[in-house]
A protein has these predicted regions:
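A generic local secondary-structure boundary/capping motif
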Residues: 20-23, 31-34, 69-72, 104, ...
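Acidic-glycine-rich active-site phosphate/pyrophosphate-binding loop
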Residues: 32-43, 185-191, 259-273
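Small-aliphatic-rich amphipathic alpha-helix that forms the alpha element of a beta-alpha
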Residues: 56-81, 101-109, 186-202, 206-217, ...
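Glycine-/charge-enriched secondary-structure boundary and capping motifs
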Residues: 89-113, 120-127, 197, 207-330
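Active-site glycine-rich loop that binds ribose-phosphate moieties when present
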Residues: 130-140, 174-196, 275-276
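Short, compositionally biased
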Residues: 164-180, 311-314
Length: 330
């Protein structure tokens, strides 16, 4: 569901107040957080979607990584997960088993366990997880935690959306698809660990609303602005070439329309002259199992770079937080 439609649907729902519900509907963050003790809070989230690759094992693993990402986006650690699935009646059992195996292996990699689940009959396959994690109540990452002067980091390249769209039409080179698959399989666990070490408070993960859509959520929640450097934003190999051919999903169009009617209508969305149609599309395009976007104080940037390097992971410093509300791409 696009961001505008989701806002309309949720507009009539009110936050149910509770002293221990630290993050709920009222904050519209990546996951719910409920305090258990002064030192432990539970992080809860759910996500599922139809297949984006042909291999059932990889589909299960990617869906699981995507589902667990919201726990990492809140600064949490994965504890356990429940399968959430729908499959056609005639789908071979070995295919379904492979989907579940892919999900279970990815949860195990995250340090968690599959504890159960629920399945229904559905015309189109769907799979994901309801994930439970934990976080210290005073160390929660939130979308509203950015402050002017913070440096912005992204932990994965953009481009999974255009690659997956091309793959559906058999219009994607195998090496390009493999690069996207490996990116989607990579957990945001290391990124969350580095961010915790750097005392991050403002973070989100880049998924269905795209980089600019999720950045806009942080702008609204933080009451600050975001300035991004186009040349520093990482893009998967082959993704820009696909974007130049106009290979975009319906999600990109919905995301762009929503932002142009919200931030854009208030003069708070600025795409500089260097941002061509292909790059703009990638910035608005939906991502699957995308990276963490987070802000750190300037004095902590070296800690972030060193932390990713020690873990053998890549990261990119792509911009900064400004006092002027809005998003600008230079």
């Amino acid at each position: 569901m696009g961001p505008g439609d989701l806002q309309d649907v949720l507009s009539g729902l009110k936050q149910q107040e509770h002293a221990d519900l630290l993050v709920g509907l009222g904050r519209s963050d990546d996951a719910a957080v409920y305090r258990i003790t002064d030192d432990v809070a539970i992080v809860s989230t759910v996500d599922f979607f139809p297949p984006i690759v042909d291999d059932p094992y990889l589909y299960g693993a990617i869906a699981a990584a995507n589902s667990m990402s919201d726990v990492y986006a809140m600064g949490g650690q994965v504890l356990f997960a429940l399968n959430v699935a729908g499959f056609p009646r005639d789908m071979p059992k070995d295919v379904i088993a492979a989907v579940f195996k892919g999900g279970a292996d990815k949860v195990l990699e995250a340090g968690g366990v599959i504890a159960g689940g629920h399945t229904v009959v559905d015309a189109e396959p769907k799979y994901g997880l309801a994930v439970t994690g934990k976080v210290h109540p005073k160390r929660i990452f939130i979308k509203g935690g950015l402050r002017p002067g913070h440096r912005l980091f992204l932990s994965k390249p953009l481009g999974t959306g255009v690659v997956a769209t091309a793959a559906k039409d058999d219009a994607c080179e195998p090496a390009v698809l493999e690069g996207a698959v490996q990116s989607m399989l990579r957990l945001n666990r290391a990124a969350a660990e580095v961010a915790r070490d750097a005392a991050v408070r403002g973070a989100t993960d880049i998924t269905g609303f795209g980089l600019l859509g999720h950045a806009a959520e942080m702008v609204d929640a933080s009451g600050a602005g975001i300035a991004l450097r186009l040349g520093d934003i990482p893009i998967l190999p082959g993704a820009l070439a696909l974007a130049e051919k106009g290979t975009f999903s319906g999600g990109m169009k919905r995301n762009r329309t929503h932002l142009e009617h919200t931030l854009g209508a208030r003069g708070r969305l600025s795409l500089g002259p260097s941002v061509g149609a292909a790059h703009a599309g990638l910035l608005f395009e939906s991502e699957t199992s995308g990276g963490l976007l987070f802000g750190v104080a300037p004095e902590d940037t070296r800690m972030v770079h060193d932390g990713f390097k020690r873990r053998g992971e890549a990261c990119w410093e792509i911009g900064e937080v400004t006092a002027e509300i809005g998003i600008a791409i230079r």
